[in-house]
Amino acid sequence: MLKTIQDKARHRTRPLWAWLKLLWQRIDEDNMTTLAGNLAYVSLLSLVPLVAVVFALFAAFPMFSDVSIQLRHFIFANFLPATGDVIQRYIEQFVANSNKMTAVGACGLIVTALLLMYSIDSALNTIWRSKRARPKIYSFAVYWMILTLGPLLAGASLAISSYLLPLRWASDLNTVIDNVLRIFPLLLSWISFWLLYSIVPTIRVPNRDAIVGAFVAALLFEAGKKGFALYITMFPSYQLIYGVLAVIPILFVWVYWTWCIVLLGAEITVTLGEYRKLKQAAEQEEDDEP
């Protein structure tokens, strides 16, 4: 009886182990950690230009003047754990200095921000091993759409949240709103990763695979924020070694860890489809055998 149960358990877990082995093989072949390091470097180079472009967009729309402040706090609180306040002060100071630049300098900021979009595009298509290239004009249009519409959609969602919060006319509705707002960062991360894995690759990505990969990445991202903040609080080795400059290596490590999570979600999305194809091919061979 015990042997039968063990055989059934082994039979059921065999596909999972096969999928995990395939996932690890793809991570190793794609040099995922190296890609994450490259993206982290470009992200740090593009951080101030990207924030400057985003805040300039909000300044162009007076209706988002109040929301832009909330969006700043939301970004730094949810995407830069533990040291968000310090980094926010420095970045806002850098952005204020960038406002004094000439038109040529402003164009340079936009190009640097678009460089990050190109690097993300290149890294994800490397993971999907796509050989097909988009037309340059189309790629530029996609990058510009993400750069402009992304912050505006985030601002609109925060504006809706700000409108819903004061509603106290229904206790049941108030409970629902509180629960939705509590999981809002997770939902936003999930949707963002799903769009990233669905739109950026130049080949068709099955929607269910993108949803699963994005959900895993969102969970890891939210857990990573809490774990990273806890680590910085409980083990302040960076503060002891670097002192007031500790914010720099902390930011480096967090950006690198974030890109590892993003690329891991992409690897999971790809592996789900590849494993399904391999399984179907194996079943087809078994059916063809006499």
Swiss-Prot record:
Protein's membrane topology: Multi-pass membrane protein
TM stretches of this protein: 44-64, 104-124, 140-160, 183-203, 210-230, 244-264
Record keyword Cell inner membrane present: yes
Source organism superkingdom: Bacteria
Subcellular localization(s) per the UniProt record: Cell inner membrane
Spans within the Periplasmic topological domain: 65-103, 161-182, 231-243
InterPro entries, sorted: UPF0761_bac (IPR023679), Virul_fac_BrkB (IPR017039)
Residue intervals on the Cytoplasmic side: 1-43, 125-139, 204-209, 265-290
The entry's keywords: Cell inner membrane, Cell membrane, Membrane, Transmembrane, Transmembrane helix
Entry keyword Membrane: yes
This protein's GO CC annotations: plasma membrane
Pfam family, one: Virul_fac_BrkB
Family affiliation: Belongs to the UPF0761 family.
PANTHER family reported for this sequence: INNER MEMBRANE PROTEIN YHJD, UPF0761 MEMBRANE PROTEIN YIHY
Protein name: UPF0761 membrane protein YihY
